Amino acid sequence: MNQKRTQVIFMTSPATERPAHNRRTAYTKTAIRRTFFELLEEKDFDKISVREICQRADINRSTFYRHYDDINALMKSIEAEFVSDIDNQIERMDPEVFDAVLVGLFDIVRDNSDLCCYMMRCGPRKGFINSLFVKNYDRTQIKWKKFFPGITDKQFRWMYIMFFNGIVSVIAEWINSDFREDPSTIVSFTTSIYFNGFRKYF
């Protein structure tokens, strides 16, 4: 007597699959990024190939191209994520939490130490620093007027240039020191100098 075989099909919902997929994607992107910056320590940017990254990261070329069109797209994606993190942090900037926001910026830099150390070593790509300057100018002006209600547009521009370039230089020195100093100590010192000085005029 023949018995019918019962086929049992286990269905997984998209919601169940998504976390695993996201973890795989994050792992793959991390491997690509790590390998990319390892190669940047060995050779110039324009000498790195997708093939080298894939061989060293032990991934297929199709996997790389699933996420990035080429090496330039990879770098732009890394920079864009970095800028997005900075933008989100600056968006939180208010008088009551100013020091905490700046400490958060230092943390973002440390979390992206591979990118930041590369920029310190080889210089940022054209327009990168300027884009940060321009992108945050207007909203920073609105927020800083909470500190200094009587400030004029021209005075704000002087202050912004001084503060922006000063913080960039301090962060650069922090990177060169291999992140030894505590960010909260640096922030407390620099902000007290800036704002105690500015308050003499406003």
What are these regions (language model features)?
Residues 1-43, 47-202:
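Alpha-helical bundle regulatory/interaction domains
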